[in-house]
């Protein structure tokens, strides 16, 4: 019997699409199996690309998880940023309440991926924290300039509020109902910005 070796035909994709498909494959693996023991070969197989192709886009697992953190942060902040836009309609405190509820809901909906990407990240400040720090800082400064938030220092207030929201949302979403967590986070934020 004369069997010919099977050849695989790969679909040529634009670089941006190929990169996204690799990140999608890595996300599927992380959600299914976690990050422990994840290899470049696993990701290449899941993405249906040659290992060499994978290395054209990412040099290591750390490079892939860093890109996944960036993508996650951009998607989440892109979704939530309009809620705190300067000059937005409605009172700032109501907009902040809406922002916190949407943030808690998004974190709850994606908690497995969030946990996998950010819990053991070996970075000084992850892209999600940096993005929310900048977003809250602009919002607080805008409220201070309008006389709605009588805070003495927008930078320290931002740091305090960010740390408080992180603690309440991280702990609360694992221990209590989402509604209870949202109410606690909203109360904390209101007391911080408008005592």
Region spans (language model):
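Alpha-helical DNA-contacting segments of helix-turn-helix folds
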Residues: 65-72, 117
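Short hydrophobic clusters on alpha-helical segments that form packing/core surfaces
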Residues: 22-30, 72, 76, 103
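Short hydrophobic/aromatic patch on the recognition helix
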Residues: 48-58
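Amphipathic alpha-helical packing segments from all-alpha helical-bundle domains
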Residues: 74-78, 98, 121-146, 155-159, ...
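Amphipathic alpha-helical segments used for helix-helix packing
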Residues: 101-124
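Hydrophobic alpha-helical connector segments
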Residues: 67, 78-109, 158-161, 182
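Basic, helix-initiating cap at the start of DNA-binding domains
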Residues: 1-33, 37-46, 63-66
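C-terminal peripheral helix-coil segments that are non-catalytic and often amphipathic
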Residues: 1-6, 88, 105, 134-146, ...
């Amino acid at each position: 019997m004369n069997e010919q070796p099977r050849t695989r035909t790969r679909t040529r994709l634009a670089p941006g699409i190929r990169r996204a498909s690799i990140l999608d494959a890595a996300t599927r693996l992380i959600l299914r199996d976690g990050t422990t023991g994840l290899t470049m070969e696993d990701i290449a197989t899941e993405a249906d690309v040659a290992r060499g192709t994978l290395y054209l886009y990412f040099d290591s697992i750390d490079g892939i998880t860093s890109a996944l953190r960036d993508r996650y942060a951009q998607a989440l902040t892109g979704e939530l940023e309009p809620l705190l836009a300067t000059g937005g309609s409605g009172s700032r405190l109501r907009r902040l309440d809406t922002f916190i509820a949407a943030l808690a809901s998004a974190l709850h909906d994606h908690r497995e991926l969030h946990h996998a990407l950010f819990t053991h990240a070996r970075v000084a400040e992850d892209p999600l924290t940096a993005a929310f720090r900048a977003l809250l800082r602009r919002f607080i400064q805008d409220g201070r300039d309008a006389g709605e938030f009588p805070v003495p220092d927008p930078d320290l207030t931002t740091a305090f509020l960010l740390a408080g929201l992180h603690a309440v949302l991280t702990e609360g979403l694992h221990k209590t109902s989402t509604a209870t967590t949202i109410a606690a986070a909203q109360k904390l934020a209101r007391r911080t910005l408008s005592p």
